[in-house]
């Protein structure tokens, strides 16, 4: 997971007195980043929070008339795609030498147009109280999620808008192979009650 530093065509935030931030992490993180940067710099931050897939689509739509300055957060692949398509500007962070090797590899793969700032793992979130109420055992592996007991009880993000959902599919393909992975997704579908726009949606639903 990473942050793209500067969107291609973005202007100087200090010169304009404002910065347009596209943020693809939890809205609470986005708000904290915007608030603290604004306090430290005096630059007004206009923040838009969307999933990685949606933000990539927005950047493509705005390619001829870029409106964003910085894209922070989300999964790595959409940032690499944006870098390859020339949607991101090249930038060298001053602290590049202090970053973890995986973060630097992201920077190198993006040819200096994106850099890793945090990493995370895909996992399952559940509400213990609801599981107890419905006499369900907490899922411990991917196979558990397709059990009939969970029919209509699961939410997952939509890969058309969410980078997290794309990572889930890519993970399943690596674990099972393409054919078995998509057969698994087909088996999982009856247990899904909603496909959310972003990867944070399902977690909020069980909180």
Say what each PLM segment does.
Residues 1-9:
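Bacterial N-terminal signal peptides
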Residues 10-15:
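Sec/Tat signal peptide C-region and signal peptidase I cleavage site
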Residues 16-81:
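Early extracytoplasmic/lumenal segment of secretory-pathway proteins
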């Amino acid at each position: 997971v990473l942050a793209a530093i500067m969107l291609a065509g973005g202007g100087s935030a200090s010169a304009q007195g404002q910065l347009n931030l596209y943020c693809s992490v939890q809205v609470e993180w986005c708000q904290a980043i915007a608030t603290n940067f604004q306090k430290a710099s005096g630059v007004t931050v206009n923040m838009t929070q969307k999933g990685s897939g949606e933000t990539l689509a927005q950047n493509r739509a705005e390619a001829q008339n870029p409106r964003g300055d910085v894209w922070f957060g989300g999964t790595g692949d959409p940032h690499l795609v944006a870098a390859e398509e020339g949607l991101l500007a090249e930038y060298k962070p001053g602290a590049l030498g202090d970053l973890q090797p995986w973060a630097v590899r992201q920077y190198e793969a993006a040819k200096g147009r994106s850099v890793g700032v945090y990493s995370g793992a895909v996992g399952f979130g559940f509400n213990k109280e609801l599981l107890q109420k419905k006499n369900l055992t907490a899922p411990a592996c991917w196979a558990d999620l397709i059990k009939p007991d969970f029919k209509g009880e699961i939410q997952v993000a939509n890969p058309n808008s969410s980078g997290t959902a794309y990572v889930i599919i890519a993970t399943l393909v690596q674990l099972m192979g393409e054919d078995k992975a998509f057969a698994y997704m087909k088996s999982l579908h009856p247990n899904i009650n909603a496909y959310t726009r972003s990867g944070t949606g399902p977690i909020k639903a069980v909180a």
